[in-house]
């Protein structure tokens, strides 16, 4: 450790960690930023060569932020280890501000032998366009070095507790809403960084063969439009995709369907009273419970219209059909995806690398057959 660097501590107190690493998306009063770091060689199985903590205030000059303190320390440390390749991991209570994000991007461009993964507890000023652009420059691949940014989940919080907190042997106890807040922040970061889906994931999960089996995940792609002068205007800041959360004793014990994760996300957008149209493209139509909750949402939000295009119809031989009828009766438009919707999703939500959408055998026939089933419902 370098004793000349100020504001470095060996471990933080448990109450400090619990207070500052709270992952509630909107919080006030957390004006100190904590950054826990680990430096490793490219051998991920080895122990960290260096691990410690920086802290700094949000509002003084950027040089006082913990990200800048880390860069100052690391550049000095790096002079003694010039030829090695290193993997650096940060666990940060707030994501970097605009100036810090730009400085980190410059640092990575100057030292391509360093890779950086940033786990953040919360997103800082994520609604500001200049901040969004700075994070995209930092994280998006453009033929050169870039950072990987992720939202802290249970495993990362537990790791920080074990490695950076003076817990006196006590286990980490997550907050009740940690998994829900993680889902919201994960989706928001995906919107901000414009995450895209792997092509294989799309073709596997959105294949519309009626007899497909083994697809236990539901993917939901979405876009939002606002009415302006009798025209629907696409809101690029609210466009992305979600999938259902699998059962997890540290997350959602019973799992959480993609539709419910999406309903959790919408209030986070803070839409005003203008007219909005939300369009979902789902790999499966909603189950009964999700359909009921979506129907309740549009009944309580008359300024939001809902369109659902499903690749396949989910039917558990139970009340799914009743749920779809309720959703339709309460004003939602429900349809089966055809070629144009599949192509739109491919062009918009998939990392297609410039490749055009290639329909699979029977796409049109399956779409027509499923449309007939939906009309009968």
UniProtKB/Swiss-Prot annotation:
Its EC number is 3.5.4.38. Its cofactor is Zn(2+). It comes from the Eukaryota. Residues 213-215, 312-319 are annotated as: Interaction with DNA. One of its GO terms (cellular component) is ribonucleoprotein complex. It catalyses: a 2'-deoxycytidine in single-stranded DNA + H2O + H(+) = a 2'-deoxyuridine in single-stranded DNA + NH4(+). Transmembrane segments: none annotated. It is found in: Cytoplasm; Nucleus; Cytoplasm, P-body. Zn(2+) 1 binds at residues 65, 97, 100. Keywords: Antiviral defense, Cytoplasm, Hydrolase, Immunity, Innate immunity, Metal-binding, Nucleus, Phosphoprotein, Repeat, Zinc. GO terms for molecular function: cytidine deaminase activity; RNA binding; zinc ion binding. The active site is at residue 259. GO terms for biological process: cytidine deamination; cytidine to uridine editing; defense response to virus; DNA cytosine deamination; innate immune response; negative regulation of single stranded viral RNA replication via double stranded DNA intermediate; negative regulation of viral genome replication; transposable element silencing. Residues 1-60 are annotated as: Essential for cytoplasmic localization. The keyword DNA damage does not apply. Belongs to the cytidine and deoxycytidylate deaminase family. DNA deaminase (cytidine deaminase) which acts as an inhibitor of retrovirus replication and retrotransposon mobility via deaminase-dependent and -independent mechanisms. Exhibits antiviral activity against vif-deficient: HIV-1 and simian immunodeficiency viruses (SIVs) and also simian foamy virus (SFV). After the penetration of retroviral nucleocapsids into target cells of infection and the initiation of reverse transcription, it can induce the conversion of cytosine to uracil in the minus-sense single-strand viral DNA, leading to G-to-A hypermutations in the subsequent plus-strand viral DNA. Accumulation of APOBEC3G induced non-lethal hypermutation could contribute to the genetic variation of primate lentiviral populations. This is DNA dC->dU-editing enzyme APOBEC-3G. It comes from Chlorocebus aethiops.
């Amino acid at each position: 450790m370098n004793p000349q660097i100020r504001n470095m501590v060996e471990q933080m107190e448990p109450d400090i960690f619990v207070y500052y690493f709270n992952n509630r998306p909107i919080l006030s009063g957390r004006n100190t930023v904590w950054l826990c770091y680990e430096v490793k060689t490219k051998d991920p199985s080895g122990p960290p060569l260096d691990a410690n903590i920086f802290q700094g205030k949000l509002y003084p000059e950027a040089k006082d932020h913990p990200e800048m303190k880390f860069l100052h320390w690391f550049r000095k440390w790096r002079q003694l280890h010039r030829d090695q390749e290193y993997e650096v991991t940060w666990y940060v209570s707030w994501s970097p501000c605009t100036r810090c994000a730009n400085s980190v991007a410059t640092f990575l461009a100057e030292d391509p032998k360093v890779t950086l993964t940033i786990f953040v507890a919360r997103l800082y000023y994520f609604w500001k366009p200049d901040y969004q652009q700075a994070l995209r420059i930092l994280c998006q691949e453009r033929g050169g070095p870039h950072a990987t940014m992720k939202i802290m989940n249970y495993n990362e919080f537990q790791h920080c507790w074990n490695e950076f907190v003076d817990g006196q042997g006590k286990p980490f106890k997550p907050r009740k809403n940690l998994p829900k807040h993680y889902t919201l922040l994960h989706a928001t970061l995906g919107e901000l960084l414009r995450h895209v889906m792997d092509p294989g994931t799309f073709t596997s999960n959105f294949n519309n063969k009626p007899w497909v089996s083994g697809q236990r995940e539901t993917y939901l792609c979405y876009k939002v439009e606002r009415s302006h002068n009798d025209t629907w205007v696409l809101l690029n800041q609210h466009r992305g995709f979600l999938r259902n959360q699998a059962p997890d004793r540290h997350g959602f014990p019973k799992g959480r369907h993609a539709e419910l994760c999406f309903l959790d996300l919408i209030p986070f957008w803070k839409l005003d009273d203008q007219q909005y149209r939300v369009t979902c493209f789902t790999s499966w139509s909603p189950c009964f419970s999700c359909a009921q909750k979506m129907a309740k949402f549009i009944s309580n939000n008359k300024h939001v219209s809902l369109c659902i295009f499903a690749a396949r119809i989910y039917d558990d031989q139970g009340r799914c059909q009743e749920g779809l009828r309720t959703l339709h009766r309460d004003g939602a438009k429900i349809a089966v995806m055809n070629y144009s919707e599949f192509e739109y999703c491919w062009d918009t939500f998939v990392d297609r690398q410039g490749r055009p959408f290639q329909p699979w055998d029977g796409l049109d026939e399956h779409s027509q057959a499923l449309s007939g089933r939906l009309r009968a419902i």
